């Protein structure tokens, strides 16, 4: 039986080795601009073309060896662990939705809002819900219709009210233990989610408090008649299980598995779902992660060929000429993920794309991996939160019947965490991790 040798060595640093990444970014960006829709162009196709290009330009190996080298990158243990987590996260999210856990969490949050603290309350609701469910899009879909209706009743500016939810949604997108961005950032940097959370939370907390304070100030004088929401307390349990076990430091796969079990127990006990319907929900959730899994595999393979051909070494070599210590390295990491996010309109993909490069930079300059993971996640959320063609902005604008461009000027939280991210770099904050 013939065995194909896998080469783990790299060639001399080469600018040409980076061309597959440039092909991907240019292809996806240019084609998206032509059709004027960043979500009609399949990102999987862009990765497929750039992957084929990467295989074609790889020299010194037979075609079979090139494909095997590509496959080695796709089968990297960190990539595979990310995929297993994506599968579990998809199963949990869909089953939680189908048993009514999302609606229960939303209603509980809304019932607790006092009228004169409506703005601050919705910001907190968006923060809590996104932290619980790990998705900013889900938070936007759940809350924007409600806050849009309130805006109509109170005469408040629709764009301003919508921006409250969009901004708050990125609090959880940035920090949640089950967020794709958190998973991608921690896996590519090789640090624990709990440790990344501690650093990331210290960076963004001041921004969250300032924005919250502003909403409290703006909320005084508002007179909104209270509404009664039906709260099904037991259906909140799956999210509480996820939050509590995550904060206790359980393995993320175990956290999600316990959450999945909780959705089944709660759904069956309350009669919200039958056993086979629950199985169907789990299957639908896992299948729904298919595109992200394919993208992750192809990104891993393409980046392995870039590494093998000397592309990573070239970037490190060029950046190290101008980087002065940890501060410069952290700025570079933030810039890398920000640029990738502008081109892909997807913060998870941006992190997956540049994460390995950021990890190399962090290693070379002694940047704490908890800090580099936080920088990756925070800068990606900043860009995703303000680009008008991001999924969150497009969804919010559609639900509120306004233009995405109208929302941007009121996105105080994404702007705030950008300021704090830059402050954390130049002021060396938090001190312990800088």
Question: For each predicted feature, which ranges?
Answer:
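Alpha-helical transmembrane segments of multi-pass membrane proteins
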Residues: 85, 116-129, 155-172, 328-341, ...
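Juxtamembrane and boundary regions of transmembrane helices in multi-pass small-molecule transporters
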Residues: 2-3, 38, 167-170, 174-229, ...
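Core transmembrane alpha-helical segments of multi-pass membrane transporters/permeases
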Residues: 44, 48, 56, 67-103, ...
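Membrane-interfacial loop-to-helix junctions in multi-pass transporters
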Residues: 76-82, 107-124, 151-161, 229-237, ...
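Hydrophobic transmembrane alpha-helices of multi-pass small-molecule transporters
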Residues: 1-87, 199-295, 434
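Hydrophobic alpha-helical transmembrane segments of multi-pass integral membrane proteins
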Residues: 83-93, 112-146, 319-359, 376
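Juxtamembrane helix-boundary/capping and inter-helix hinge elements in multi-pass membrane proteins
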Residues: 61-63, 75-79, 98, 155-159, ...
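Short helix-coil transition sites and intra-membrane helix breaks within transmembrane domains
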Residues: 60, 81, 93-102, 118, ...
